[in-house]
Amino acid sequence: MKVLKFLMIVLVFMLTFGCNQHKQSPKSFKSQDILNVLNGMTDLMIHDISNPPLASRFFAYACIAGYEVVSQHDKDLPKLNKILNKYPALQKPDSIEESSYQLSALLAMIETAKKMQPSGSLLIQYENLLLDSCRIKGFSEETIDQSKKYALIVSKHVLAYAKADRYNRISNYPRYAPDGKPGSWYPTPPAYMAAVEPYFNTVRPFTLDTCNQFQPVPPVEFSTKKNSDFYKLTMLNYKDSLSDEHQQIAAFWDCNPFAVQDRGHLLVGVKKISPGAHWIGITGIACGNTNKSFEKSMQVFTVVSVGLMDGFICCWDEKFRSNRLRPETAIRR
């Protein structure tokens, strides 16, 4: 009788253990996985030559999609509808059960970027690699399928929010034309490129009350007189000598997405990451070096990307208010 009881206990244990083996054990992701998605977006931005303000918009909404998923599972994270302007609340869908919310967050970022970036469809290649790696880790097809459905629901919600930010109206505005006044902006040779996003200050900000909430002091008054402050600033370009270290630092922060260089009779276009992508990369390094959790990293990336877009809205508002010629233009003249 004792032997029978013992065998019954062993059988129950084996059945319980076996059933648990079929259930999806939790698989965790790291901050690097978030950065990998953003790096994939950056590669497309370089490919598409996305301008800096627009690049910040792509980063912001992708991160918002990822954060929305994570915040529905982490009570310590504040809800976006209490932070962002006119952001509608979204409850976790009841129809989603066996999902990995971390995987859903990454997929929501990818899905949002796929719809917003000009060449976003190319991200399907990265998405497939991500899902293949999940299968190798032991994710079941049910978990992957449910995670994708969850991501699509959140991404659709965020894309609707993005569509309402008024960026899609900019194409209806008249083409920006220089006013021709001395010291005002004018296309710079050799490319003579048009003004970049002159109406970006009309886009709805995330956290600002208005685009001119932090209006800076006007720049030094333009003047060609040798005793003027503007002329003195111009001459610093010829008087100051930079060390090799300072030149390397300057080159490090040179984030012009598309610079045109004249080399004899040739014009060469050089494509680089945007300023926003530079800061996203730095954010990734900071999260990795401090061993931030996936959830905390998603919060940090979202704060940085939202701040980048609001920062561009403020800067571009002043850029076209002060209407100052580019330093390169002044130097060439």
Region annotations inferred by a language model:
Residues 20-333:
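Acidic/polar surface patches and capping/hinge elements
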Residues 2-10:
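Sec-dependent signal peptide recognition
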Residues 15-18:
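C-terminal motif of bacterial Sec signal peptides marking the signal peptidase cleavage site
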